[in-house]
Amino acid sequence: MNDGDRLERYAELAVRVGANVQEGQEVFVHGLVEHAELIRALTRQAYRAGASYVNVDYRDQHVKRAMIEIGPDEALTYSPEWLKKLAETTAGNAQLGTTGDPEPELLADLD
C-alpha cells in the first residue's frame, strides 16, 4: 500500500467511524494549511460518505504570529460576530479537525 492509499484509508476511517458522517449531512473540516493533503482526503471521503456539503477552514500559524507580534492587543481576545454565528450554525454538523503542529517552535519566543 502506498502513502496515498494509506492516507485515503485513514481519512475514510476518520469520516465514517470517527465523525460518523451520514447521507445528506453537512461537514465542517478545519486544520492547519500544512495539513492540506489530509484535509483534501477527508473532504473526498466525506463526499463519498454522502455529505451534502463540506466546508473547509484552513488556519495558518504564520498569520497567528503576525497578529500576536504586530496586531493590536485587542486582537488577542477579539471574536467577530460572524465567527460566533458560524459556530452556532455549524453546531449540528459533523466536524473533523486535524491536529499536530508542524512548526512547534514558531510561537515559542512570543510573550
Label each residue range with its predicted role:
Residues 1-111:
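Active-site bordering "gate/hinge" segments
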